[in-house]
Regions:
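Peripheral, non-catalytic segments of secretory and membrane proteins
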Residues: 1-156
Length: 156
């Protein structure tokens, strides 16, 4: 789910839940507080397709994508899901400076492709600090994921 973002703000990931009900939560939107903090955010360099519903027999085509940062100093946190198979074109998505993230433990997936008939296996995990999600291809769970820090202070 891609929620609306207020003008001047950007998202660091989209929202996912394990059912088809109306979205019941929100995501974290970010905005530079001043000129110095602009360097903490960066638009993605590219998008990598993580999953498509090809082979599932679903009535609507869908895909999940994860951005890649332009620089190793930045981390792109959340994945996005969208209709169709074309690469996203999101001007309001940003990656964050590495000093703003931390490793978090992995809980159970909020969604997986198990039973969908999809040719690609993927698990979707919730990032609790940013309230976004991260899609991981394959059947195995990662040991940890990266999310925004609970304490957002940073010096560099």
């Amino acid at each position: 789910y891609l929620p609306g973002i207020p003008d001047g703000y950007a998202m660091i990931g989209a929202y996912a839940q394990g059912n088809y009900d109306k979205p019941s939560d929100c995501i974290l939107a970010v905005k530079p507080a001043n000129e110095q903090s602009i360097s903490l955010l960066q638009i993605p360099g590219n998008w990598n397709r993580v999953w498509t519903d090809k082979g599932s027999g679903a009535s609507m085509d869908g895909s999940i994508w994860h951005p890649t940062p332009q620089s190793n100093n930045y981390v792109c946190l959340g994945s996005i899901a969208k209709k169709g198979y074309k690469q996203p074109n999101l001007s309001n998505y940003v990656c964050v400076h590495r000093c703003l993230v931390e490793s978090i433990p992995v809980n159970y997936p909020v969604w997986s492709t198990k039973g969908t008939g999809s040719k690609q296996k993927t698990n979707v995990y919730k990032l609790h600090n940013s309230n976004s999600f991260f899609a991981v291809p394959g059947k195995n769970s990662p040991a940890s994921l990266t999310d925004i820090k609970g304490n957002m202070s940073c010096s560099f």
